[in-house]
């Protein structure tokens, strides 16, 4: 009977292939934590999305314990991600199933399992303080501060307009 219950997992709540490269522990320990975690990583947020908006959306799937906004490590301003902790794994699974891939603030959000929030992880890991993915981005994205940081600093050229 228990083997039938274990096979109920759908791909939408399965573990992704992504693993936090800064995890303090072995790959096996990280896998073990991911399987029981009730913490989610939420990415591709607008820099202007508020904690209240996130709470309103994610509380539709269950009781939210806390939300930790991702911050630029130098400016302490939102930088496009957060962690959402639920009281139960089942509520977190509901969020994975129903919220991943939906729109919030005109952006398609990515929701993934997280091994659990540790103080310090709320800060962006990019050289300029934000997320690494925003450093070299050459497209103009108003929801994420315009061009990527390297373009804004003149270290990469902005894409030219073709006629």
UniProtKB/Swiss-Prot annotation:
The keyword Cell inner membrane does not apply. Disulfide bonds: none annotated. It comes from the Eukaryota. InterPro entries: NCBP2 (IPR027157), NCBP2_RRM (IPR034148), Nucleotide-bd_a/b_plait_sf (IPR012677), RBD_domain_sf (IPR035979), RRM_dom (IPR000504). One of its GO terms (cellular component) is nucleus. Residues 38-116 form the RRM domain. Its main location: nucleus. Keywords: mRNA processing, mRNA splicing, Nucleus, RNA-binding, RNA-mediated gene silencing. MRNA binds at residues 18, 41, 110-114, 121-125, 131-132. It is found in: Nucleus. One of its GO terms (molecular function) is RNA cap binding. CDD domains: RRM_NCBP2. One of its GO terms (biological process) is regulatory ncRNA-mediated gene silencing. Component of the nuclear cap-binding complex (CBC), a heterodimer composed of Cbp80 and Cbp20 that interacts with m7GpppG-capped RNA. Belongs to the RRM NCBP2 family. Component of the cap-binding complex (CBC), which binds co-transcriptionally to the 5' cap of pre-mRNAs and is involved in various processes such as pre-mRNA splicing and RNA-mediated gene silencing (RNAi). The CBC complex is involved in miRNA-mediated RNA interference and is required for primary microRNAs (miRNAs) processing. Also involved in innate immunity via the short interfering RNAs (siRNAs) processing machinery by restricting the viral RNA production. This is Nuclear cap-binding protein subunit 2. It comes from Anopheles gambiae.
């Amino acid at each position: 009977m228990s083997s039938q219950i274990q096979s109920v997992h759908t791909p939408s709540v399965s573990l992704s292939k992504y693993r936090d490269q800064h995890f303090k522990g072995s790959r096996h320990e990280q896998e073990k934590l991911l399987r029981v975690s009730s913490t989610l990583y939420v990415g591709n947020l607008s820099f202007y999305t508020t904690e209240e908006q996130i709470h309103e959306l994610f509380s539709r799937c269950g009781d939210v314990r806390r939300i930790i906004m991702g911050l630029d490590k130098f400016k302490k301003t939102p930088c496009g991600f957060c962690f959402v902790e639920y009281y139960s794994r089942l509520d977190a699974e509901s969020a994975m199933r129903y919220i991943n891939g939906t729109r919030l603030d005109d952006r398609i959000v990515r929701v993934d399992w997280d091994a659990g929030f540790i103080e310090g992880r709320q800060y962006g890991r990019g050289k300029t303080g934000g997320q690494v993915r925003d450093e070299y981005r050459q497209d103009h994205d108003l929801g994420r501060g315009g061009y990527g940081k390297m373009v804004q600093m003149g270290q990469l050229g902005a894409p030219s307009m073709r006629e």
